[in-house]
From Swiss-Prot:
The gene is hisE. It is an enzyme of class 3 (hydrolase). Pathway: Amino-acid biosynthesis; L-histidine biosynthesis; L-histidine from 5-phospho-alpha-D-ribose 1-diphosphate: step 2/9. Keywords: Amino-acid biosynthesis, ATP-binding, Cytoplasm, Histidine biosynthesis, Hydrolase, Nucleotide-binding. This is Phosphoribosyl-ATP pyrophosphatase. It comes from Pyrobaculum aerophilum (strain ATCC 51768 / DSM 7523 / JCM 9630 / CIP 104966 / NBRC 100827 / IM2).
Length: 94
């Protein structure tokens, strides 16, 4: 299964950061720095776990979407992309 939405989402994240609009959640999150973004990724990961244990499949999907979005912002803030993660996964499969 190909999930091209990640490429689109990465492009939107880059665009929102480049625009520098303080009304944009993405821009504000990015501007808050790696430490804050990393904490947010941790919070979202916990929310996925809680949803898996107590809230049902729909909530797991919703919280997973939040986690993936925040992870993409974190990767961007470190000068990385999902492509870098994909390369590592491909390397591990060899």
């Amino acid at each position: 299964m190909s999930c091209q939405i990640f490429e689109k989402l990465e492009a939107v994240i880059r665009q929102r950061i480049a625009e520098g609009n303080p009304q944009s959640y993405t821009y504000r999150l990015y501007s808050s720095g790696v430490s804050t973004i990393a904490r947010k990724v941790g919070e979202e990961a916990v929310e996925v776990a809680v949803a898996a244990l107590a809230e049902g499949r729909e909530r797991v999907v919703e919280e997973s979407a939040d986690l993936l979005y925040h992870l993409l912002v974190l990767l961007n803030s470190l000068g990385l992309s999902l492509g870098d993660v994909c390369k590592e996964l491909e390397r591990r499969m060899k």
